[in-house]
Swiss-Prot record:
A Pfam family recorded for this sequence: ThiG
Gene: thiG
Keyword Amino-acid biosynthesis found: no
Record's protein name: Thiazole synthase
Active site annotation, chain numbering: K118
Localization: Plastid, Chloroplast
E.C. code: 2.8.1.10
């Protein structure tokens, strides 16, 4: 006879993620590219439990908004906050123009007060590394126009602080190159950014597994954005669910407070009172 065991009824206190003037209970964000089809994308988004979904404005433009094949028209936006992004922009000026276009698209589908933009300025077509100066220039202008700016950057603590001081609602350092699945290759710098930040730090790019997402959350990241790891998995909805669990576990562990690493072994069983006979 096979025994079954119920999971613990314990419910950890998970604090909300605050970005600008909005609160979110999920700390996992998802991108919308690379899925096999619309149905798989929708199932993955649901399985992830995410509340923030980022869509490339250029891809939304190139698809017919009224088309049933377009992801924008295929989701229940009452449960999801849309974050347009400026992917594909190579200059600050181009990113600014696309950010304004993204804001108009969100209004057209009912997000009247949505000023979110994921700012990407990427002139490097091979490694897809962001332009720090271009990002800062674009961010300063967009903040002045009442955008809630979430900038994608290298794991540069100085730039992260400059963007925070410019009024960005978060900073989004890359863990490793976009789509690489290499995890947190810039761990030390990301830790410095988190330590110095007064805004949420969202680890964006390079997350390949739930354990890597958990690692980011364990060091105090405010959230994680994943795309390729989910969309290219053999079972995308299953991976989306696993990513949700990884983020939840990492955040709960961070709040719990981990033990300090030691050089010597420490017995887990008490030695006081043992018989010496």
């Amino acid at each position: 006879m096979t025994e079954t065991f119920e999971m613990s009824p314990y419910q950890p206190v998970i604090d909300p993620l605050v970005i600008g003037e909005r609160q979110f209970t999920s700390r996992l964000m998802l991108g919308t590219g690379k899925y096999k089809n619309l149905d798989e994308a929708k199932k993955s988004i649901t399985a992830s439990g995410c509340q923030i979904l980022t869509v490339a404005v250029r891809r939304a433009q190139n698809s017919t908004i009224q088309s049933m094949g377009n992801l924008i028209t295929g989701l229940d936006w009452s449960k999801i906050w849309l974050m347009p992004n400026t992917a594909g922009c190579q200059t600050a000026q181009e990113a600014i123009r696309v950010a304004f276009l993204g804001r108009e698209i969100t209004k057209n589908i009912g997000f009247e007060n949505n000023n979110f933009t994921k700012l990407e300025v990427i002139p490097d077509p091979k490694y897809l590394l962001p332009d720090g100066l271009g990002t800062l220039l674009a961010a300063e202008y967009l903040v002045s126009k009442n955008f809630t700016v979430l900038p994608y950057i290298n794991a540069d603590p100085i730039l992260a602080k400059q963007l925070e001081n410019a009024g960005c609602a978060t900073v989004m350092p890359l863990g490793s190159p976009i789509g690489s699945g290499q995890g947190l290759k810039n761990l030390s710098n990301i830790q410095i950014i988190i330590e110095n930040a007064n805004v949420p730090v969202i680890v964006d790019a390079g997350i390949g597994t739930p354990s890597q997402a958990a690692q980011a959350m364990e060091i105090g990241a405010g959230g994680v954005l994943a795309n390729t790891a989910v969309a290219k998995a053999q079972n995308a909805p299953q991976m989306a669910y696993a990513m949700q669990l990884g983020v939840l576990a990492g955040r709960a562990a961070f709040q719990a407070g981990k033990i300090d690493a030691g050089k010597l072994a420490q017995p887990s069983s008490p030695i006081v009172g043992l018989s010496k006979k």
